[in-house]
């Protein structure tokens, strides 16, 4: 049976007022777990969050994190059982920047791997723009180590007339 997860950004305004109540409702909707969104973890310790989510039959699959919060998240997220630390997107405007971004993703992937997680990249529509003869997302995929970096394809951002999102 498939598992379904929800990104907490969908409920960010409600979560700040009633974290446990909102999460309990999310669990009752049939979700198996969450993707933490920029530190929305209800003020729980890592172990406390994992225990609370387990009590409502959910888990942390991933977390969107800002680059400047990487070190803090490398300490916090493993205790929650989180599997993926997700970069929310990069502003890439040249082939050189795309190659530099790929190396950055590999570097972050090595850090995530050192604590038992995998680093991921969340696309936006600009990642499907061509730089020369290749789309940015293709440059990133071709130049990152799949053992270190995963790609979280956001189908809404990938939906373009010239892109077959199913390929990704």
Where are these regions (language model features)?
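N-terminal pre-domain/capping segments
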Residues: 1-83
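Hydrophobic/aromatic residues located in beta-strands of well-ordered beta-sheets
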Residues: 4, 60, 85, 119, ...
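Conserved beta-strand positions
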Residues: 8, 36, 87, 121, ...
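Short, small-residue-enriched loops and turns at beta-alpha junctions
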Residues: 12-14, 40-43, 67, 92-94, ...
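Charged helix-capping and loop-helix junction motifs
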Residues: 20-21, 47-51, 98-106, 133-138, ...
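Alpha-helix-loop-beta-strand connector modules within alpha/beta enzyme cores
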Residues: 47-65, 108-112, 137-147
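Glycine/small-residue-rich loop that forms an oxyanion/phosphate-binding "nest" at active or ligand-binding sites
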Residues: 70-106
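Acidic/histidine-rich catalytic cores of soluble enzymes
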Residues: 114-168
